[in-house]
Regions:
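Single conserved hydrophobic/aromatic residue that forms the stacking wall/gate
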Residues: 209-219
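Alpha-helical solenoid repeat scaffolds
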Residues: 1-183, 187-211
Length: 219
């Protein structure tokens, strides 16, 4: 019901060009309203994103990417620079650490190459990622991967989300698929490339340990 209601609100948004969310799903409503206002280029967009990012009870720092991407689209680079100065890369997710590096290097267009609030597929892709992430947090990795594949199909530009499907594979001890997924990151996105290199090394170590244990058992 939650997925259906949210998708219906997006379909209505795309058809009628107005947001008409009935608040009943807590923070999910706030997330949806942030993206829907962003799609409409509403002046409320900033406040919705900042309310999420600054939530004291939960970590919604992921939405920093979309907030700053929208500010770049609106050519408000001063706001982007000032916000980036507050980001601690050592305490941030891979995505937000990568965002800070781009901004510090004045590569602002990186934030708009991968996502646009005016692209309906991009917005729906983020919604499906949200559902995927929820299932992953419940250790329901098969469901998570289904929604993540839908998300990736809708917006293949946002390949950073592949890190979640790789982590799902690892959690299921499917190291070969995890390794193949991580291989899709290259050195043009330095933070993700570093994470890929570190994680693949750990995966190889696990595979070698498993092989040695099998040899010892059957040898």
């Amino acid at each position: 019901f939650i997925i259906y209601s949210s998708l219906k609100s997006y379909i209505d948004l795309f058809i009628y060009k107005k947001s008409d969310i009935v608040e009943q799903f807590g923070k999910l409503d706030l997330i949806n309203m942030a993206f829907q206002n962003c799609y409409l280029n509403s002046k409320k967009t900033e406040s919705y994103f900042l309310n999420l990012i600054n939530d004291p009870q939960s970590d919604y720092s992921r939405y920093t990417f979309f907030y700053l991407s929208n500010e770049v689209s609106n050519n408000d680079l001063a706001t982007v620079d000032n916000f980036a100065d507050t980001i601690d890369p050592l305490r941030s997710s891979l995505l937000i650490s990568q965002v800070k590096k781009w901004i510090d290097e004045k590569k602002y267009t990186k934030l708009t190459q991968h996502f646009s609030c005016q692209n309906e597929n991009d917005i729906l892709a983020e919604f499906f990622f949200l559902i995927s992430n929820f299932y992953s947090s419940q250790s329901r990795f098969d469901y998570s991967n289904i929604y993540l594949n839908i998300s990736n199909y809708l917006n293949p530009k946002f390949y950073f989300n592949l890190s979640l499907i790789a982590e799902n594979y690892q959690s299921n001890n499917n190291y070969d698929l995890a390794k193949k997924t991580f291989e899709k990151f290259d050195d043009k996105d330095e933070i993700f490339f570093w994470y890929k290199t570190k994680t693949i090394a750990r995966i190889i170590a696990c595979l070698l340990y498993t092989a040695d244990a099998a040899d010892e058992h059957f040898g």
